[in-house]
Structure formats: structure tokens, C-alpha cells
């Protein structure tokens, strides 16, 4: 049930027939490759980039899109609910500590970490910023192509002075380009690695600047070795568009004296430990007092 070439245009939502249309993609470019009309595709829910010839594509109508996305939306809601429970538990823990086990009646305030989120996909960036806002994470979002991140990250760190950086977008491993150990076989992994190194040259300490880096199927080991605290993708699987938000938000709301257990961070993500991993990292939340309500309030 394919479609003819003339039926597919940029921004159309399509599926790949060779993969039984299991993932929705948006057409972001159309090129001639080896004499064949080929679409460059961005995953709608996964941070995956792919090329596909037109004869392998099927334009998905709204009903078909809804059938595929319904399961993803349900998983998103479940993950968000679990994450909110985690955040509430962290807040209770901080409150218990600062009030001396509720024996003292202190008015206090909390300062979560600031996040700088660089994203190669403007659509995903908007989705992530909406989720940051829902959770209450201070964030500056920047749309930046993956290949430009190594040049852009240094000046952006100087400008915004973040506690946490997210470097993400789209990626993919291509078996035809080399073995899984070869970083040149990946679409954008080497640029994520270079950007992590640039960021670490600004702030070498793993707990002074927390870094998440990677996208679908990214070269996990190289990203961690370059200095990322958390990265994708240990098993070279696809990761969900919103997974980076859950990871950094958990760090934002964990006290700076407490370490974040890696499993506690990834267990409620949409992808889990096959797509996400990292190293033990301290939180960045700080508590202050007194909090005084102004007369105008």
C-alpha cells in the first residue's frame, strides 16, 4: 500500500513499509540519492533520523496516526505521573531535612538547577520546553543543528551559566558505514561527543556541570568517555523525544548533597536502561531561608 512519488511532500507524516510502519516519521527533506528519490525523515516520537526511498513510504492518514500515537501518549502520561510522584517525594525529603524533621517552622525557598537545552529538532524542543514548564524546571532552550553544537556550546555556557546541559536532537547507527564501535558509522554521535568535550573544557568537574548527551542509537560509550554524566544509547535503541527532560529534571530537584542513583533516574523514563545510562551524579537543588512574603503579595 505505498504511495506515488507526487503524493509525498515535505512535512508529510509517513511510515516505512519495510518496517511495517511501526514508527511515524515526518519528511524534512527530499533528495536524489543514487538516482532514487529519497526522503530524509525525523521520527515523530523518537529521536531517530533516517533516509528512505519513496517506494518504501506510505503516507499516514490521521486515523492511522492516532492508532500508532495512542500507545505513546498513554506511556507519556504514565511516565509523567510516576515522575511527578518522584518529585513530590524529593520535595518532602527536602522539607523534612530543612525543618529538622518538622520540629521547626522555617519559611524556606528552593533553587533548582538551571538547564540549557540544545536541540537539533525545533518541534521536539517545543515539546520539551512545555514539559519543563509543567514540572517547574528553569530552562533556556536553543534550537541548534547537531553539527553546529561543538561551535555553539562554549559561548552559550558563557552566556547562560547553566548547572545542567542537554545536547540532543536526532541520530542513527548505519550498519553499512561500519561496526557499532566505529563512531563514524553514526549520523551525529561524533558531533555530540565534540560538544561534550567543549563543555567539559569549560567545566571539568562532573558535579559542577551535569551533561546529558545523545539521541536515538547514539554511541553511548564515547559520550560517557568524553565527559557526559548521562547519555544514550547503551543498546543502540531508539529513545523517546522527552526522555532527556525526565533525566535532568530529576537531577534539578535532588539536593546538592545527595547523589542521584542511575537506576532511580532512568527507571521511569519511556525508554529505560536499554536506551539510557550514566554515572552516579550529585543533585543541584539548593535550599535557602528565610522566605518572606512581601506586603504586595
What are these regions (language model features)?
Residues 1-10:
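Mixed-charge, Lys/Arg-rich low-complexity intrinsically disordered regions
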Residues 21-32:
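Short beta-strand-centered aromatic/proline hotspots
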Residues 33-42:
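Short, solvent-exposed secondary-structure boundary/capping segments
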Residues 45-101:
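Intrinsically disordered, low-complexity, charged/polar segments
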Residues 129-140:
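Short helix-loop-beta junction
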Residues 157-170, 228:
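Proline-aspartate-enriched helix->loop->beta-strand connector
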Residues 193-239:
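Catalytic cores of nucleophile-dependent amide-cleaving enzymes
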Residues 238-297:
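C-terminal functional extensions of proteins
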Amino acid at each position: 500500500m505505498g504511495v506515488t512519488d507526487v503524493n509525498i511532500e515535505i512535512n508529510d507524516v509517513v511510515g516505512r513499509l519495510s518496517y511495517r510502519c511501526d514508527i511515524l516519521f515526518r519528511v524534512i527533506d527530499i533528495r536524489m540519492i543514487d538516482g532514487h528519490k529519497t526522503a530524509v525523515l525525523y521520527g515523530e516520537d523518537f529521536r531517530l533520523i533516517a533516509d528512505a526511498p519513496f517506494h518504501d513510504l506510505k503516507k499516514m492518514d490521521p486515523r492511522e496516526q492516532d492508532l500508532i500515537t495512542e500507545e505513546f501518549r498513554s506511556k507519556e502520561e504514565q511516565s509523567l505521573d510516576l515522575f511527578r510522584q518522584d518529585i513530590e517525594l524529593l520535595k518532602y525529603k527536602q522539607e523534612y531535612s530543612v525543618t529538622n524533621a518538622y520540629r521547626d517552622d522555617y519559611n524556606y525557598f528552593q533553587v533548582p538547577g538551571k538547564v540549557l537545552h540544545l536541540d537539533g529538532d525545533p518541534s521536539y524542543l517545543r515539546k520539551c520546553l512545555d514539559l519543563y514548564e509543567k514540572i517547574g524546571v528553569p530552562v533556556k532552550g536553543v534550537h541548534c543543528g547537531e553539527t553546529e553544537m561543538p561551535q555553539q556550546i562554549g559561548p552559550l555556557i558563557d552566556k547562560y551559566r547553566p548547572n545542567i546541559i542537554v545536547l540532543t536532537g536526532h541520530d542513527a547507527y548505519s550498519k553499512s558505514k561500519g561496526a557499532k564501535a566505529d563512531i563514524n558509522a553514526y549520523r551525529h554521535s561524533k558531533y555530540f561527543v565534540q560538544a561534550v568535550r567543549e563543555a567539559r573544557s569549560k567545566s571539568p568537574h562532573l558535579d559542577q556541570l551535569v551533561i546529558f548527551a545523545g539521541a536515538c542509537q547514539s554511541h553511548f560509550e564515547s559520550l560517557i568517555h568524553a565527559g557526559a554524566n548521562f547519555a544514550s544509547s547503551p543498546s543502540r535503541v531508539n529513545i523517546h523525544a522527552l526522555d532527556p527532560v525526565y533525566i535532568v529534571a530529576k537531577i534539578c530537584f535532588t539536593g546538592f548533597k545527595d547523589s542521584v542513583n542511575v537506576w532511580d533516574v532512568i527507571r521511569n523514563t519511556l525508554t529505560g536502561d536499554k536506551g539510557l545510562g550514566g554515572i552516579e551524579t550529585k543533585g543541584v537543588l539548593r535550599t535557602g531561608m528565610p522566605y518572606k512574603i512581601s506586603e504586595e503579595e
